[in-house]
């Protein structure tokens, strides 16, 4: 079984682990993934852009740097990779810059819960594609009832539009 890496965000698809959230159970080979599939973290790169980083039982050459293995549930490194483009001309950099520009403290809606305490609802925006999660509305198609706070969503949840991780969401103001 092999591992394939997105050249933009360094997400790694591991055939052994699969990616159940994307519908690929453990053991799903790279060849069976549809050609139109895109990186679930950045949605910028298509399957054809991925590079093989580990194949079968082959091990990296001695003395060679071993790439960070990051799966759908592992957050990215904080520091930038020297091989990644950091210019604002890349599509993912443009998308993230636009979303971060909008990332201001959210004007909150509020309501009282069953105990009489005031609950403040906020909106969260995906920095990759701009999807907005509104706590007041929830997302019934994802199984989150109205009033479900973002912090109560499981950590392995991904953006329903682009597949980005929960860590790729920031507070949003209308």
Curated annotation (Swiss-Prot):
Fe cation 1 binds at residues 6, 9, 39, 42. Keywords: Cytoplasm, Electron transport, Iron, Metal-binding, Repeat, Transport. Gene3D superfamilies: 2.20.28.10. One of its GO terms (biological process) is alkane catabolic process. GO terms for cellular component: cytoplasm. Binds 2 Fe(3+) ions per subunit. InterPro entries: Rubredoxin-like_dom, Rubredoxin_dom, Rubredoxin_ET, Rubredoxin_Fe_BS. Pathway: Hydrocarbon metabolism; alkane degradation. The keyword Transmembrane does not apply. It is found in: Cytoplasm. Residues 97-109 have a biased composition (Basic residues). Residues 1-53, 121-172 form the Rubredoxin-like domain. Belongs to the rubredoxin family. It comes from the Bacteria. Its cofactor is Fe(3+). Involved in the hydrocarbon hydroxylating system, which transfers electrons from NADH to rubredoxin reductase and then through rubredoxin to alkane 1 monooxygenase. Residues 56-115 are annotated as: Disordered. Residues 56-65 have a biased composition (Low complexity). It comes from Alcanivorax borkumensis (strain ATCC 700651 / DSM 11573 / NCIMB 13689 / SK2). Fe cation 2 binds at residues 126, 129, 159, 162. GO terms for molecular function: electron transfer activity; iron ion binding. This is Rubredoxin-2. SUPFAM superfamilies: Rubredoxin-like.
